[in-house]
A protein has these predicted regions:
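Flexible loop/turn segments at secondary-structure boundaries
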Residues: 20-21, 88-89, 128-132, 162-167, ...
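Flexible, glycine/charged-enriched surface loops at secondary-structure junctions
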Residues: 153-155, 186-190
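Active-site-proximal beta-alpha core segment in soluble small-molecule metabolic enzymes
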Residues: 1-157, 167-168, 177-180
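Intrinsically disordered, low-complexity coil segments
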Residues: 24-34, 182-184, 245-258
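Short glycine/threonine-rich loop-to-helix capping motif typified by GTGT followed
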Residues: 132-138, 164-174, 199-206, 210, ...
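Acidic/histidine-enriched ion/cofactor-binding microenvironments in catalytic or ligand-binding pockets
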Residues: 73, 145, 151-153, 169-180, ...
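Charged (often Lys/Glu-rich) extended helix/loop segments that serve as interaction or gating elements
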Residues: 188-348
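Solvent-exposed alpha-helices and their adjacent loops that cap or buttress functional pockets
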Residues: 29-30, 52-53, 72-74, 90, ...
């Protein structure tokens, strides 16, 4: 967080605890206010009290009731209205839970004015892992329409959920949409690229601790689980890929391939649904092999538990931009990794 602050990055906070952590980075309340958004549309009283004490930046509302809640405590920092936008096709859509419908925005604005609550702008989120990047353009247009009755400078929060694989395309789409906005409309554009920043920040290295024959290929157990670093699978609908690190004997013998066949990776817990991945084209593994899972920084450690008494893995920090040479001898990851559908949240 210190590095981010030094780089001029602001903080999108969801709770009182996150506000406390962010506030500790700043020398003055005014600097903290200018660098934060309390972006949870539904806040408990204790967190609102923390935000007022710390003098956070604006919060977010998506209902008349939330505006009334703020007015009751004499909230002074202003609010952004979170609007519901098209997030169909995103890996993690949010509009079923968050966001005001277009028809409800005028009522929120009217109630806010009558209660002395300043509306400072609009926020939206097209869903994490957005697959249709044109949704950003449509959401920006909707945000501008929602701002139409307002006067003075406004904030538009573009949301987050940016994936490393599509970030540059998403950024280009957003930039083109912003360029089309008349310069006479004074807007401060902000976004929440937390996933993008965190994704490549951490790799996971895990040993294979078990192997046995199954009805269709091998069944392997690794020293991690869905309840640990792979919580990104049920909660974030991730499909992690891995690389096997070659052992010294293979490197010396220049043996670069193993047989490929169907296989399943299970986690180490006593839960039978603790399945990490399955594939019809998985390289055969052996007990003692180490697997390298790149890009395991987003929604992994933060949601990990110690279920069944298994500890969280040791964290090793490095300033190197490339992996250590010992990690560079590996086999290609499996192709066509299947989604483990029975451990995912249901999709309506």
């Amino acid at each position: 967080m210190k590095w981010l602050k030094q780089a001029g990055v602001g903080f999108d906070c969801a709770s009182g605890m996150e506000l406390e952590k962010a506030a500790a980075l700043f020398d003055t309340p005014s600097a903290f206010t200018a660098s934060t958004v309390f972006a949870n549309p539904c806040k408990p009283p204790r967190d609102l009290a923390t935000a007022m004490r710390l003098q956070s930046g604006p919060t977010v509302v998506d209902s008349v009731e939330e505006v009334q809640k703020l007015a009751a405590i004499n909230w002074k920092q202003g609010s952004l209205i979170r609007i519901a936008v098209d997030d169909q096709g995103s890996k993690m859509p949010f509009s079923k839970k968050f966001g005001a419908a277009v028809k409800d925005i005028p009522a929120i604005q009217t109630i806010a004015r009558s209660l002395g609550q300043e509306i400072k702008g609009i926020s939206f989120h097209v869903g994490s892992g957005c697959q249709d990047l044109t949704q950003y353009s449509r959401a920006i247009q909707l945000a501008l329409l929602s701002l139409a009755p307002s006067k003075g400078p406004k904030i538009v929060d573009l949301g987050g959920g940016f994936e490393t694989e599509t970030f540059h395309k998403a950024a280009k789409c957003i930039q083109e949409s912003i360029k089309a906005v008349p310069s006479t409309i004074p807007i401060q554009w902000i976004a929440e690229p937390g996933r993008f920043m965190a994704s490549d920040f951490q790799d996971l290295f895990v040993p294979v601790i078990g192997k046995k024959a199954g009805s269709n290929g091998w069944r392997y157990t690794i020293d991690e689980s869905l309840y640990g670093q792979f919580s990104c699978i049920p909660f974030d609908r991730a499909t992690p890929k891995w690389l096997r690190i070659q052992n010294e004997g293979e490197i010396a013998a220049r043996k670069t391939t193993r047989k490929r066949m169907p296989g399943v990776l299970f986690g180490r817990t006593c839960d039978s649904v603790d399945m990490i991945a399955q594939s019809d084209d998985m390289e055969e593994l052996e007990v003692g092999d180490w697997l390298w899972f790149p890009k395991m920084g987003a929604y992994t450690s933060v949601t990990a538990t110690e279920f069944n008494g298994f500890p969280k893995p040791k964290v090793i920090y490095t300033e190197e931009s490339q992996p250590h040479p010992m990690f560079m001898g590996f086999e290609p990851w499996p192709t066509k990794i299947k989604t483990v559908s029975h451990v995912l949240a249901p999709q309506n």
